[in-house]
């Protein structure tokens, strides 16, 4: 068994070796250090949870270094996706959860929102820019998601529920 003083020396030596090893790797042309951060939220299907989850995601987005303008659009898209999951997907059934996963990488921000509802086909959603839909009080959420994000796609899980995946690429 190591004596505590010996283990401190061993640890500090290991730290130095690790720093040198990382530096050596970074100097190689085929290696780079990539930081990927993720966060996951699970929330009940209540209207109040939409604001709480959107605020948590906005904090993550702001810490990720996304521009203020992009962060505004991401916030709108996230709020709409979560609201759709809570209201339309899970139909405000508090026994059903909405899962939100956010992943920040050097080239993009990816957000997934999954509900436990029946699912739907986004192709069947009316175009909110058509004259007959302009004055409707709802129906713009998917339009906002598609316009504020670079990629938006939906999938239905075999066990039920709908997932929306939204990606915002970073501008270098």
Outline where the language-model segments fall.
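Conserved beta-strand-loop-beta-strand hairpin that lines the nucleotide-binding pocket
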Residues: 2, 25-40, 86-172
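Extreme N-terminal basic, low-complexity initiation segments
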Residues: 2-9
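Cationic, low-complexity basic patches in intrinsically disordered or flexible, solvent-exposed regions
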Residues: 10, 16, 24-28
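Generic detector of N-terminal low-structure segments
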Residues: 13-14, 33
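STAS-typified acidic loop motif
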Residues: 40-51
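Conserved short strand/loop->alpha-helix "switch" segment adjacent to the catalytic nucleotide/phosphoryl-transfer site
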Residues: 55-79, 134-137
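Conserved polar catalytic motif of the HATPase_c/GHKL fold
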Residues: 80, 84
């Amino acid at each position: 068994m190591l004596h505590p003083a010996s283990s401190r020396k061993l640890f500090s030596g290991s730290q130095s070796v690790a720093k040198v090893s990382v530096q050596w790797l970074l100097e190689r042309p085929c290696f780079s250090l990539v930081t990927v951060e993720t966060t996951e939220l699970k929330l009940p299907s209540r209207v109040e949870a939409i604001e709480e989850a959107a605020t948590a995601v906005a904090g993550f987005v702001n810490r990720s270094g996304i521009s203020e303008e992009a962060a505004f659009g991401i916030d709108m898209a996230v709020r709409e996706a979560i609201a759709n999951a809570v209201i339309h997907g899970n139909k405000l059934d508090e026994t059903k959860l909405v899962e939100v996963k956010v992943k920040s990488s050097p080239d993009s921000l990816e957000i997934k929102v999954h509900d436990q509802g029946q699912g739907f086909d986004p192709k069947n959603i009316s175009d909110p820019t058509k004259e007959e839909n302009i004055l409707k009080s709802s129906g713009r959420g998917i339009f906002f998601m598609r316009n504020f994000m670079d990629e938006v796609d939906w999938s239905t899980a075999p066990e039920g529920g709908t997932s929306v995946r939204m990606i915002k690429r970073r501008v270098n």
